Design a protein with these regions (language model features):
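Residue(s) in the substrate-gating loop at a strand-loop-helix junction
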Residues: 171
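Substrate-binding pocket helix/loop in short-chain dehydrogenase/reductase
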Residues: 109-128, 132-137
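Alpha-helical segment proximal to the catalytic Tyr-Lys
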Residues: 156, 200-201
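Active-site helix of classical SDR
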Residues: 151, 187, 195
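Active-site loop-to-helix junction immediately N-terminal to the catalytic Tyr of the SDR YXXXK motif
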Residues: 177-185, 197-199
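Conserved glycine-rich cofactor-binding loop
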Residues: 20-21
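Conserved glycine-rich Rossmann-like NAD(P)H-binding loop of the short-chain dehydrogenase/reductase
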Residues: 34-51
């Protein structure tokens, strides 16, 4: 896999949550090829090991580069697990310079079955009135808290260095609500608001915070 840019990230450490997924593993690969030491975070140890091995092999085959990509298993909505991963990553790869918050997703119980209500009340299991409150909380937690908590854990060293980059993953639903996906859109809107807040909050500390709408 070719990377369509060439920047020097030698000496930098990048942490990518959701790093074993399709989108974020590609981001991790690009960072590694550009010279960063990359920690990918996810919950499935076997998948993390498989993705780390594949990215390392792909970089060697495509660029003849020996890159560093390592997997770390933890739950991004569990601050204790994140803190433990932070300590391990710092000891093995160095303190975080780049944080990509890619963990996220949606659940069927938090999606309506129709786009627009056509009658007084819709009786589907997935009508607005029957949405599962636990699944809505799960979507909000994974997307929003799963972005906020890694930032709390991994940015303290950035403040000390007065340098760092945070990349959150927003969505078109952050600014333009899509039908059916109520909880996901709410969460992505919150992420965009959080990103703007952090950009101001960290503005004089040398830390950048951005959110592409993917």
């Amino acid at each position: 896999m070719k990377v369509p840019f060439n920047i020097n990230l030698s000496g930098k450490t990048a942490v990518v949550t959701g790093g074993s997924g399709t989108l974020c593993s590609a981001m991790a690969y690009g960072l590694a090829v550009c010279g960063a030491k990359v920690a990918i975070i996810g919950r499935n140890k076997e998948k993390l090991a498989s993705v780390s091995e594949k990215l390392t092999k792909d970089a060697l085959d495509e660029y003849n580069k020996n890159v560093i990509v390592k997997g770390y298993s933890c739950n991004v909505i569990n601050k204790d697990e994140l803190s433990a991963a932070y300590e391990t990553i710092k000891n093995e790869l160095g303190s975080c310079d780049i944080l990509i918050n890619g963990a996220g997703g949606n659940q069927p119980g938090a999606i309506t079955s129709i786009e627009m209500l056509k009658k007084e009340k819709e009786d589907s299991d997935y009508s607005f009135w029957n949405l599962d409150e636990d699944r809505i909380r799960d979507v909000m937690d994974l997307n929003y808290m799963g972005t906020l908590l890694p930032i709390q854990v991994f940015t303290k060293d950035m403040v000390e260095k007065r340098s760092g980059s945070i990349i959150n993953i927003a969505s078109v639903t952050s600014i333009l609500p899509l039908t059916k996906v109520i909880a996901y859109g709410n969460a992505k809107s919150a992420i965009l608001n959080l990103t703007q807040w952090l950009a101001v909050h960290f503005g004089e500390s040398g830390i950048r915070c951005n959110a592409p709408r993917l």
